[in-house]
Amino acid sequence: MNPLFTQERRIFHKKLLDGNILATNNRGVVSNADGSNTRSFNIAKGIADLLHSETVSERLPGQTSGNAFEAICSEFVQSAFEKLQHIRPGDWNVKQVGSRNRLEIARYQQYAHLTALAKAAEENPELAAALGSDYTITPDIIVTRNLIADAEINRNEFLVDENIATYASLRAGNGNMPLLHASISCKWTIRSDRAQNARSEGLNLVRNRKGRLPHIVVVTAEPTPSRISSIALGTGEIDCVYHFALYELEQILQSLNYEDALDLFYIMVNGKRLKDISDLPLDLAV
């Protein structure tokens, strides 16, 4: 019998395959490959073969693939993370945000002040010009935690009343908003400046928060280690990059004998900058 997280990982891959998000076109190019780059072509094909990708007449448009990848990542996080209630109990929510609401995170406690900032910028063009877009942060997926009522806090012992711990972030009785636990950026591929904006958004999350910093992570299906490293290497902006098929990526790099790419792969893995998608739920439980 396989562990549940192995099953969740297989379901995640099956959804990508069944939806033709990960697919091979009739020219042999896999949907997450750069067809003009030989290494990208070969690595992506190797991973797709291991995951049993089928041939389709044409790949999905880039934006469609990206949105679908976000949705499937969100479903994976939701399903896997809820199995960790015994490790990380709480009233959790996982939500796909996308680019629909540039102030979605202002609904949560650490970033509630951004609403007032946005309003002030709206009313003052000079302030808007000075601020730029540094305060607008649009995660693809968020994990949030609802606050705890005093009755639950006091369930085993009488810990708090209206005169103590009156500013505690986790306490519902203090009139606080829910907490942002994690910001997840999904990048189907990493081939443009826009794809690499995950680092700048991560830095904005660090700079603009009041209170506890949420987890800041990136999930990608990019096949080439060199492009993954453009986001993964370095520290400060993001916790870690999670690859949709890390084990398969390692296997293909070994079989293709891409030694320099494999060296970079191990630098990222051993440096705790790159992990598998199956590691994400447990890391979110920290």
UniProtKB/Swiss-Prot annotation:
<feature type="binding site">
    <location>
        <position position="140"/>
    </location>
    <ligand>
        <name>Mg(2+) 1</name>
    </ligand>
</feature>
<keyword id="KW-0479">Metal-binding</keyword>
<keyword id="KW-0255">Endonuclease</keyword>
<dbReference type="InterPro" id="IPR015105">
    <property type="entry name" value="NgoMIV"/>
</dbReference>
<keyword id="KW-0540">Nuclease</keyword>
<feature type="binding site">
    <location>
        <position position="186"/>
    </location>
    <ligand>
        <name>Mg(2+) 1</name>
    </ligand>
</feature>
<feature type="binding site">
    <location>
        <position position="140"/>
    </location>
    <ligand>
        <name>Mg(2+) 2</name>
    </ligand>
</feature>
<dbReference type="Pfam" id="PF09015">
    <property type="entry name" value="NgoMIV_restric"/>
</dbReference>
<keyword id="KW-0460">Magnesium</keyword>
<comment type="subunit">
    <text>Homotetramer.</text>
</comment>
<dbReference type="GO" id="GO:0009307">
    <property type="term" value="P:DNA restriction-modification system"/>
</dbReference>
<protein>
    <recommendedName>
        <fullName>Type II restriction enzyme NgoMIV</fullName>
        <ecNumber>3.1.21.4</ecNumber>
    </recommendedName>
</protein>
<dbReference type="GO" id="GO:0009036">
    <property type="term" value="F:type II site-specific deoxyribonuclease activity"/>
</dbReference>
<keyword id="KW-0378">Hydrolase</keyword>
<dbReference type="GO" id="GO:0046872">
    <property type="term" value="F:metal ion binding"/>
</dbReference>
<dbReference type="InterPro" id="IPR037083">
    <property type="entry name" value="NgoMIV_sf"/>
</dbReference>
<keyword id="KW-0680">Restriction system</keyword>
<dbReference type="InterPro" id="IPR011335">
    <property type="entry name" value="Restrct_endonuc-II-like"/>
</dbReference>
